UniProtKB/Swiss-Prot annotation:
The gene is MT-CYB. The keyword Transit peptide does not apply. Disulfide bonds: none annotated. The chain crosses the membrane at residues 33-53, 77-98, 113-133, 178-198, 226-246, 288-308, 320-340, 347-367. This is Cytochrome b. Component of the ubiquinol-cytochrome c reductase complex (complex III or cytochrome b-c1 complex) that is part of the mitochondrial respiratory chain. The b-c1 complex mediates electron transfer from ubiquinol to cytochrome c. Contributes to the generation of a proton gradient across the mitochondrial membrane that is then used for ATP synthesis. Coiled coil: none annotated. PROSITE patterns: CYTB_CTER, CYTB_NTER. It is found in: Mitochondrion inner membrane. Heme b b562 binds at H83, H182. Heme 1 (or BL or b562) is low-potential and absorbs at about 562 nm, and heme 2 (or BH or b566) is high-potential and absorbs at about 566 nm. Its main location: mitochondrion. Binds 2 heme b groups non-covalently.
Amino acid sequence: MTNIRKTHPLMKIINHSFIDLPTPSNISAWWNFGSLLGACLGIQIITGLFLAMHYTSDTATAFSSVTHICRDVNYGWLIRYMHANGASMFFICLFLHVGRGVYYGSYSYTETWNIGIILLFTVMATAFMGYVLPWGQMSFWGATVITNLLSAIPYIGTTLVEWIWGGFSVDKATLTRFFAFHFILPFIIAALVMVHLLFLHETGSNNPSGLNSDSDKIPFHPYFTIKDFLGLLLLISILMSLVLFSPDLLGDPDNYTPANPLSTPPHIKPEWYFLFAYAILRSIPNKLGGVLALVFSILILAILPLLQFSKQRSMMFRPLSQCLFWILTADLLTLTWIGGQPVEHPFIIIGQLASILYFSIILILFPMFSLLENKLLKW
């Protein structure tokens, strides 16, 4: 008798995706982040559901309802901080996952890559709206500043901003709709993840060498299920250490002050995972130019397949491109640091130079170095 997992319509899908999936035998720990992102999404949806049971999306009570969750709900503090720090873990895994894709040339799978970029934008939108919900000072002013950027769009800008706000400023209507969107988007993300995996399983996984691995595939279970489980243990260990020892390490103290439209905080800044894009936005003096630079700082990932001039897919055997990749990583860390600093000398010029370097590396230096490496290898 054939095994039920190979015949039952539902079990068959699970079997082909997680059990009998042919996987390259040489994929490293950098390939763990997909499953870790799935785990993060699961944690966020579960903790978020329990938070939503006690949260009220009204400007008068939102801040107090979060305080109530932390003080009066059983393990409410744990759920709240797991959700807040879970978002940070989510973005750490996302950045490493995207970085892996760039390093090993996984962007050659264009459908998977483009769905991934849509996922990145959706997760960023969800995180931004989630940050507004506690209705602290940084929530209110962050929402005001970021939504206001849309007013830079010619002709329809102002109307668009007021339409999003549901009035003439960030208020009750804005908070209510942000809560509604923040609740629904993770389920849309889950659906997009299915599409992401669907396209990935059409081609099979890439591997560190960037070569075709059809001749050396092994079943996903038990080899990679056990490997993913180790990654999951590490993820949960780091997350719980953060939650239980220093839950406010990555947060902003200003968000413990209830939102006050009459008092502007000295430094308005988003959560740490948006700081690199925020630094790029601030480094351009023109409003529309800044908004375009902000969008293109992530959308630039979509043109990576067009900038691939190397005869080798992966950077594993390309020392010049490797060097450039790590300079880009350092540059992104610099931008993250600058995004959290006040707008004054020398931070302004450092931010501008780091922004120029970011776009130059991706648009000019990567293609140049690829061609140079081809020449050095007489290809």
